């Protein structure tokens, strides 16, 4: 039968891409239907119980700045928070959180159920309704037809999913869930370019059987406790838990090597390519044969379960091998395995067949988001889902789409990489993929994107009011620092010595003083005159977020301006030739991945090199430096 209501947007799938897509479309004012095979698994964390990390945390902040749910749900469910790269510059600092799976799923479901314009319905989708080159709806497994102006497909690993444990395999979308084989077959009939990829997950451990006394404890950050959402507070967090660290050893590696003949990866059973940056433990042992040990992080799955996720031992080896390798790890000699690890192969579609809006070029109104586009990770999926959902809603309403630029957002980098370069392996976001990363920081995601989100209808009044106050306060303080001047008569020698390391000899703006590497905003605001009065404070010192933003904007202003100039210079290098006999292994500043790809493709020019999948703009800069050195060296020899 035909369902009696028609929709603007149908979202197929309730994972991280699907939930953000449905919420975004509904926030944008579209009448939205989310179809899922199981309402109980909406927002399910299918693999690791964590959100964020290098590059990934940036995407989560951007989703949040655009009104998405992932960050605030993590604040409500996070049981450990850390800032990675905290000793490095703000461009590469990233938030990461361990999340209670149940609390996270509940937080996402609550937002879905309370979102105006959004309907949920539990049925697996077996078919798409296509008229000519236009999608017009979806058909469920009981033949129920739902009609809509646009459809967002977020099928994850379910399209013709095949689960492997050793040489045994069976159909599944993930452990305990059926695959979407009928939908996968229908998409093949539409002749969209596709391939197979693979991902995996480790066995799960009963924490009561672990000997923690021999393990290294890894606590979260406590001063201050990080938050993910720009609307988040540390008081939202549930009780915090530590993680623990153990290591593989020679015995572990011997066990794994002994089981490789029964590994589906190494026996040719698995054809799909796995994620380079989240390899299985057997892949690590094979690729890094000279490495004596690998870290394994024991991560709690939640507050009300003893289940532990051993991050670092993803595997599809036979269970008897999994059993031995787990028991070879220090602290896990008597560990009880609750669930076996496994690998899963699934269909994906070449993202080069997508527009930058994430709409398919071949079928109008059909959008793809998440792992179906060849990406890996909750965060990458959520970001794509938000963009696809927003653009599906805009199209259904006859409005112009939004395509984020590379200089606006990591989301822009992600989409541009996908639709222009495609993928040969599951794509993971890193800060190194962004040439504008000094501008694309976690801390300014709202300043970059919330105004855009408001214009698109994605940002509600509460977020907009909080953002407006922050934006205005930062702008006012930065302007005050630029326009307030200090001379030697006002800043006494002893105060200057304490603040700057030496007395000042002429007049400086507060902004100029703050740009000095040894001067912090806090110290500048606390500096006093001979009369004991504050020289420039208190400013916005009482608000850590505002103070950090002001200091970062002032200190990095020059670097960001120079970076913009550098990007323009790349255009002039488009036709610069690369020597045919260049030894890429000699360019040691390039990552192994980039050197490998350049050796395979052998591009003739810098422009061609820049378009090789996986070769980042940052890598092109390093290659240009190497070519300049080669040119300079050959000129010296000729002289």
Swiss-Prot record:
NAD(+) binds at residues 274-288. Transmembrane segments: none annotated. Its cofactor is FAD. Keywords: Cytoplasm, FAD, Flavoprotein, NAD, tRNA processing. One of its GO terms (cellular component) is cytosol. It is found in: Cytoplasm. One of its GO terms (biological process) is tRNA methylation. GO terms for molecular function: flavin adenine dinucleotide binding. Gene3D superfamilies: FAD/NAD(P)-binding domain, GidA associated domain, C-terminal subdomain, tRNA uridine 5-carboxymethylaminomethyl modification enzyme MnmG/GidA. FAD binds at residues 13-18. Homodimer. Heterotetramer of two MnmE and two MnmG subunits. Belongs to the MnmG family. NAD-binding protein involved in the addition of a carboxymethylaminomethyl (cmnm) group at the wobble position (U34) of certain tRNAs, forming tRNA-cmnm(5)s(2)U34. This is tRNA uridine 5-carboxymethylaminomethyl modification enzyme MnmG.
């Amino acid at each position: 039968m035909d369902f009696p209501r028609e929709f603007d947007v149908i979202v197929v799938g309730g994972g991280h891409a699907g939930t953000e897509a449905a919420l975004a479309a509904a926030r944008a004012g579209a009448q939205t239907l989310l179809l899922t095979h199981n309402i109980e698994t909406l927002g399910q964390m299918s693999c690791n119980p964590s959100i964020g990390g290098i590059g990934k945390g940036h995407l989560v902040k951007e989703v949040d700045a655009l009104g998405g749910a992932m960050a605030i749900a993590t604040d409500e469910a996070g049981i450990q928070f850390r800032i990675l790269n905290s000793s490095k510059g703000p461009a590469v600092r990233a938030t990461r959180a361990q999340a209670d799976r149940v609390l996270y799923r509940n937080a996402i479901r609550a937002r879905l159920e309370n979102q105006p314009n959004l309907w949920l319905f539990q049925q697996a989708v077996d078919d798409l309704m296509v008229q000519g080159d236009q999608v017009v709806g979806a058909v469920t497994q009981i033949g129920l037809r739902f009609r809509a102006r646009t459809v967002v497909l977020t099928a994850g690993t379910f399209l013709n999913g095949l689960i492997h444990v050793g040489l045994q395999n069976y159909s599944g979308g993930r452990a305990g869930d059926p695959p979407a084989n009928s939908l996968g077959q229908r998409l093949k009939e539409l002749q969209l370019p596709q391939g197979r990829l693979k991902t995996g997950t480790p066995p799960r451990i009963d924490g009561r059987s672990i000997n923690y006394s021999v393990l290294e404890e890894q606590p979260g950050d406590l001063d201050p406790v990080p938050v993910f959402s720009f609307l988040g507070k540390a008081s939202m967090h549930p009780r915090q838990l530590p993680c623990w660290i153990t290591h593989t050893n020679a015995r572990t590696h011997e066990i794994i090597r002994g089981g490789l003949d029964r590994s589906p990866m190494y026996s040719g059973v698995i054809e799909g390519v796995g994620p380079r940056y989240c390899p299985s433990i057997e892949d690590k042992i094979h690729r890094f044969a000279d490495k004596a040990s690998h870290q394994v992080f024991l991560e709690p799955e939640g507050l009300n379960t003893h289940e532990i996720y051993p991050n670092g031992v993803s595997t599809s080896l036979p269970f008897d091998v999994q059993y031995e390798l787990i028991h070879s790890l220090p602290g896990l000699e008597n560990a009880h395995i609750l669930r076996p690890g496994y690998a899963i192969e699934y269909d994906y579609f070449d993202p080069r067949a997508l527009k930058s809006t994430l709409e398919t070029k071949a079928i109008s109104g059909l959008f793809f988001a998440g792992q179906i586009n060849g990406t890996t990770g909750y965060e990458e999926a959520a970001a794509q889902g938000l963009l696809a959902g927003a653009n599906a809603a805009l199209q259904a309403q006859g409005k112009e789409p939004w395509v984020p630029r590379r200089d606006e957002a990591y989301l822009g980098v992600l989409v541009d990489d996908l639709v222009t370069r495609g993928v040969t392996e599951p794509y993971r976001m890193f800060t190194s993929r962004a040439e504008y990363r000094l501008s694309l920081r976690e801390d300014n995601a709202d300043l970059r994107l919330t105004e855009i989100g408001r214009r698109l209808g994605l940002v509600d009044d509460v977020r907009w009011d909080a953002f407006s106050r922050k934006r205005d306060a930062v702008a006012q303080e930065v302007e005050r620092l630029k326009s307030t001047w200090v001379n030697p008569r006002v800043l006494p020698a002893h105060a200057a010595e304490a603040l700057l390391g030496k007395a000042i000899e002429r007049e400086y703006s507060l902004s100029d003083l703050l740009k000095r590497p040894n001067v912090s905003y806090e110290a500048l605001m606390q500096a006093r005159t001979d009369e004991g009065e504050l020289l420039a404070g208190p400013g916005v010192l009482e608000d850590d977020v505002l103070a950090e933003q002001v200091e970062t904007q002032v200190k990095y202003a020059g670097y960001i301006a120079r970076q913009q100039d550098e990007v323009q210079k790349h255009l002039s290098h488009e036709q610069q030739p690369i020597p045919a006999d260049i030894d890429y292994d000699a360019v040691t500043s390039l990552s192994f991945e980039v050197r490998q790809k350049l050796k395979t493709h052998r591009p003739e020019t810098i422009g061609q090199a820049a378009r090789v999948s996986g070769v980042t703009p940052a890598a092109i800069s390093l290659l240009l430096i190497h070519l300049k050195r080669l040119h300079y060296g050959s000129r010296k020899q000729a002289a």
